[in-house]
A protein has these predicted regions:
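Glycine-rich, aromatic-bearing surface loops/beta-hairpins
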Residues: 105-107, 115-172
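Sec/Tat signal peptide C-region and signal peptidase I cleavage site
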Residues: 20-24
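Beta-strand signatures of extracellular beta-sandwich domains
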Residues: 47-49, 61, 128
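Short coil-to-beta strand junction motifs in C2/discoidin
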Residues: 40-47, 124
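Short amphipathic, basic-aromatic surface patches that mediate peripheral association
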Residues: 29-41, 64-67
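Structured domain cores in non-transmembrane regions
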Residues: 54-120
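Structural beta-strand segments of beta-rich domains
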Residues: 25-29, 44-46
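Bacterial N-terminal signal peptides that target proteins for export
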Residues: 1-10
Length: 172
């Protein structure tokens, strides 16, 4: 059974929608976690966050070992150093639904909805992806951009060791 919904806007609401330029409302982030050939491999802890000059960092996602007994996985979050200093030590990332398990090698995707991006003022931002691995290295990839972006715009960069290709596509 297929349901259809129609929303008809009239008056001022219709005028605002028709007249305003299209801007991105959500972002799809793609992160490549490379498979490293090392004697002892551990999946990395990864933080995805937004930085803006003069504003607190905004955590979009944090992957860590959430399944460890007695919440032991949180003990190592400070190894994701840049994120930890910028926002992690406040502990608010746990309550806001942004945390999840570490992820296996391969291309990993997350979507950040408009509510999580809400309130971004026009200006310069940096999307930061930071990875740290037990018995391994640490790497930070930065994707600078100017907000608001037009829907369909993609920003990309690549890491060298702990992260591979990273991209963010902004959607209406």
């Amino acid at each position: 059974m297929q349901l259809r919904h129609h929303l008809i806007l009239t008056g001022a609401a219709a005028g605002l929608i028709a007249a305003g330029p299209a801007t991105a409302q959500s972002v799809d982030v793609s992160i490549t976690v490379p498979r490293l050939t090392v004697a002892e491999y551990h999946k990395p802890y990864v933080a995805v966050y937004l930085e803006a000059t003069g504003a607190p960092a905004r955590t979009l996602s944090i992957w860590y070992d959430v399944a460890k007994a007695k919440d032991e996985g949180r003990k190592w979050l400070n190894e994701v150093r840049g994120w930890w200093r910028a926002s992690g030590r406040t502990g608010s990332y746990i309550a806001d639904g942004s945390s999840g398990a570490t992820r296996a090698p391969g291309v990993q995707k997350i979507s950040v909805n408009a509510a999580r991006l809400g309130g971004l003022k026009p200006g310069q931002y940096t999307l930061v992806i930071e990875a740290a691995r037990e018995v391994g290295g640490r790497e930070v990839v930065r994707l600078p951009f100017t907000w608001p972006l037009k829907p369909g715009q993609t920003i990309q960069a690549a890491g060298k060791t702990e992260l591979g290709a990273v991209s963010a596509t902004f959607k209406p």
